[in-house]
Regions:
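Short S/T/G/P-rich N-terminal loop/turn motif that feeds into the first structured element of a domain
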Residues: 1-43, 47-58, 67-70, 93-105
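Conserved RNP beta-strands of RNA recognition motif
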Residues: 62
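An amphipathic, aromatic/His-enriched active-site/gating alpha helix that lines ligand/cofactor pockets
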Residues: 65-98
Length: 105
């Protein structure tokens, strides 16, 4: 990953079984429309690196790279009314171990 491509974030979204998007036509439509906006997000500098669903936990893990935090928030905005989310800035383990290299200290 190139730093000029932006920071990397892991977005963690969850919901209760009762408000699971898979339980209603409206919820499924919302989730499908959200996911279909990936191309628009890419045009705004939000690159999806990976995305996983833990279906039995009602949880999504979406790793993104973004230059603009506001564009990142706009991408995830459709989830906010029915999901609980957290967006964590992260670095790779390789980058981190270089940073804490005891030979540098």
């Amino acid at each position: 990953m190139n730093d000029s491509d932006g920071m990397v974030f892991v977005a963690h979204w969850t919901h209760t079984p009762e408000n699971c998007p898979g339980r209603s036509k409206e919820g499924a439509t919302m989730l499908n429309e959200f996911w279909a906006r990936r191309d628009l997000a890419a045009k705004k500098g939000v690159k999806i690196l990976s995305a996983y669903v833990a279906a039995t936990e009602h949880t999504y893990y979406i790793t993104v790279q973004a230059k603009d935090y506001q564009a990142l928030l706009e991408f995830f905005e459709p989830l906010a009314p029915t999901q609980t989310g957290a967006i964590h800035p992260v670095t790779t383990m390789d980058e981190w171990t270089k940073h804490i290299d005891p030979k540098r200290k």
